[in-house]
Amino acid sequence: MVSTSGRKLMTEDTVRTIQEELFPLCSLITPNLGEASLLLSNPVTDIEEMKLAACELANRYHCAVLVKGGHLSGNTMCDVLYNNGRFSLFEQQKIESRNLHGTGCTLSSAIAAFAARGKGLEEAVRQAKVYISTAIYHGKDLHIGHGNGPLCHFFSGEINFVPLNSTEEVIRKFPHK
């Protein structure tokens, strides 16, 4: 609905159709800050506002909500999951990269893949975040085209999903080759 650069990607009619026809079928929606702001007609700019937004969107659409905070100010990012009346925060250091095109789509696809493998939602999100951080890290030095480039979905090495509490742990476990 809204790109990472803040640009609207669809008409109001399309957004309304998504809200009325698609969201009722979802078990999870994953709006970024701009999308959460658009859906609620209120700015969402910090973690407390993300929690309020996640709760309100979950109540409105009757599903779990992961508000993605990749564009929060500062060096730390935080995603807020609201599921069954409970918040889970996923905080990590930002990885500096201009190659972030497709992060939201990749994250939601990875969550779906881990859920399909039998993981509970919180664990699926945690493992998807490890995957996405690793793909960002391995793609940060790629020079493909102009402007925002893609993540590196083809990094080598197996990810064994042990608890990793920070981006630094991800980088140590999966060094760039």
Over which residues does each language-model region extend?
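Conserved beta-loop-beta/alpha segment of the NTase-like Rossmann-fold superfamily
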Residues: T4-S5
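Conserved phosphate/ATP/ADP-binding segment of small-molecule kinases
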Residues: K8-F87
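Glycine-rich beta-alpha junction loops
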Residues: E35, G70-L72, K94-E96, A128-I132
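Short, small-residue alpha-helix embedded
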Residues: L38, S97-L121
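Short, charged, surface-exposed loops that flank catalytic or proteolytic processing sites
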Residues: P43-M50, A116-R126
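Regular secondary-structure segments
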Residues: Y82, S108, A112-A116, K129, ...
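A structural signal for small-residue-enriched, beta-sheet-centric alpha/beta enzyme cores
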Residues: S88-E91, T134
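Charged C-terminal helix
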Residues: E123-K177
